[in-house]
């Protein structure tokens, strides 16, 4: 799914509003995913998955950092996320559906925290962006 110029602008503007909260929102999205889709917990058997867990916060920071990097390289997501794609496909062997579940959880989290900025157009642009990220992360499964 190709991001239009308007989509890219919307994604950059929305992620800019996230600002210093990116890690916290990433952790909240993970918590939301674990609660809404309990099967996703199977990939984190060594984590304390309770609310406010340092491990979930730490992984939320990693998710947010990867997304921040992706937002900065919207024209080269495959190159930007290549190492993460390798990691998730070959070492972690994460079921590709989980990227969609995390994307959904992140959209809900952003909608909760940025209600005035989360317009239908921004929602659509972020959804397309996260779908593209998911596609790149699962590209090496084939």
Swiss-Prot record:
Sequence positions that bind heme b: 88
Chain positions with Phosphoserine modification: 4, 36, 50, 103, 125, 139
Any one Pfam family match given in the protein's UniProt record, by short name: Globin
Gene Ontology terms: biological process: hydrogen peroxide catabolic process
Modification sites for Phosphothreonine: 109, 135, 138
GO terms, molecular function: haptoglobin binding; heme binding; iron ion binding; organic acid binding; oxygen binding; oxygen carrier activity; peroxidase activity
Domain Globin as annotated: residue spans: 2-142
Modified residues (N6-acetyllysine): 17
Domain of life: Eukaryota
Function: Involved in oxygen transport from the lung to the various peripheral tissues.
Miscellaneous comment in the UniProt entry for this protein: Adult sheep and other mammalian species produce unequal amounts of alpha-globin from their non-allelic loci. The alpha-1 sequence is shown.
Self-association state and partner proteins as the record states: Heterotetramer of two alpha chains and two beta chains.
Protein known as: Hemoglobin subunit alpha-1/2
Phylogenetic classification of the source organism: Eukaryota, Metazoa, Chordata, Craniata, Vertebrata
